């Protein structure tokens, strides 16, 4: 049998998202377009006799950071060594970088053996949030309506490197809505909600205060008509966990954020929900 690892096409990335949905990860309906825009060479497919059977994404950000996701071997080929070959090819692409990932519970021990260490846990909370309106002195605007450079600079406070190609696509795809919170002309919050096969996902979710973050979630749910939402909440930000509970969301799924190097220097206090488990 012949096993070959190649760089995936846009269609392959769509297939990877479908596999992720089979695993219960509930990616957004159109996420694959933004994923491919982030780094078109990042998506590796392992083909057994020409048939796709395993995958990994290894996105390069800037010069020093990378994020690993979509590490999947299809059930019929698990335990046969194909997944680890894809893993090794992916890690080779990110050699010399601080690499992050969000690992499912069953794989965390293996990731530690590969040099990753636990930074925090992302706890997915799901439920029906109350309607939200901006706190006093704060207004909401469509994130596409402000200068993109301003939005990208704000996003950079919470992410280790610039990700302009990804971000520009992330806010403009169909089946989603994005809002910024403004106070005295300054951005004090930003959130995106996208439709998924199950609960609509929120990410990123940034806010100068829990009240701003909460209101963004409620406003986005109203805009999209979402009856159920899901947020991957970093448990290192205790007010974020408390906020998810206060708006009626319940824990449903857990991953570990792990890095090969130091925790990135970002504004964790304003990070109420990570963007995606696949690309960070």
Regions found by a protein language model. Give the residues of each.
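Hydrophobic alpha-helical segments and helix pairs
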Residues: 86-137
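Intrinsically disordered, low-complexity, positively biased terminal segments
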Residues: 2, 9-14, 34, 47-48, ...
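Glycine/alanine-rich phosphate-binding loops at beta-alpha junctions
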Residues: 3-57
């Amino acid at each position: 049998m012949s096993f070959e690892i190649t760089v995936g096409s846009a269609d392959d990335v769509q297939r990877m998202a479908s596999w992720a949905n089979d695993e219960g990860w509930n990616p957004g309906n159109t996420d694959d377009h933004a994923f491919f825009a982030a780094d078109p060479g990042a998506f590796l497919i392992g083909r057994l006799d020409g048939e796709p059977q395993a995958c990994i994404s290894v996105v390069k950000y800037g010069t020093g950071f990378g994020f690993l996701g979509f590490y999947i071997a299809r059930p019929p080929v698990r335990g046969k060594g194909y997944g680890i070959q894809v893993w090794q090819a992916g890690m080779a692409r990110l050699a010399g970088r601080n690499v992050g990932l969000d690992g499912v519970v069953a794989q965390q021990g293996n990731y530690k053996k590969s040099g990753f260490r636990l930074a925090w846990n992302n706890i997915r909370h799901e439920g029906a949030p109350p309607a939200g309106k901006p706190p006093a002195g704060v207004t909401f605007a469509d994130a596409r309506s402000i200068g993109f450079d301003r939005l990208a600079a704000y996003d950079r406070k919470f992410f280790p490197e610039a990700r302009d190609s990804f971000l520009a696509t992330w806010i403009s795809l169909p089946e989603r809505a994005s809002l910024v919170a403004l106070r005295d002309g300054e951005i004090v919050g930003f959130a995106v909600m996208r439709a998924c096969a199950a609960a609509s996902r929120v990410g990123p979710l940034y806010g100068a205060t829990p009240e701003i973050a909460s209101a963004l979630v409620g406003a986005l749910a109203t805009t999209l008509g979402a009856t159920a939402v899901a947020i991957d909440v970093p448990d290192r930000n205790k007010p974020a966990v408390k906020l998810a509970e206060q708006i009626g969301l319940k824990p449903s799924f857990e991953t570990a954020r792990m890095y090969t190097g130091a925790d990135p220097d970002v504004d964790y206090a304003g990070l109420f929900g990570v963007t995606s488990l696949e690309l960070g």
